């Protein structure tokens, strides 16, 4: 075959949504029937995309959470993903209608036994006027008006993002009575090379 360069998308061709509760492995990129299937990070979540040989991009799955790997069949994509602040499960994406169905329930017992803090999304502007985003987890048993200690979590990288994905460490802190703040400052992924470049 002929090797050709596809148009640059100004985005990492991978899911860089951070979590401390996922294992590696599995497909991150594959080709089938004239399409290149891959993950990319958009702001604070993973997208599952495909691109044809002319460089036309199609976003197949675009919702909060993290996708760690996938497998493509004729009319479906099977993926391991974190949805709704749950640990990773197996999901099926129907390529005909775009519907997503959860297939496994490996972690239902864990979620039934543990009270999780749900992230609240917020935005703010830095000194340069650039809009940044972040999340806050409230302490377990939160009571308005009561004072609580807080922890600011920072991600490494460069080119990683925090999003609505389960973090064991953060949930442990919230369960111990802490507010947990985490943001995506300059240098984070998901917003193009200019935003990620901090040098």
For every predicted segment, state its role.
Residues 33-34, 75:
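Short coil/turn segments that connect the beta-strands within blades of beta-propeller domains
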Residues 36-39, 78-80:
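Residue position within the beta-strands of beta-propeller blades
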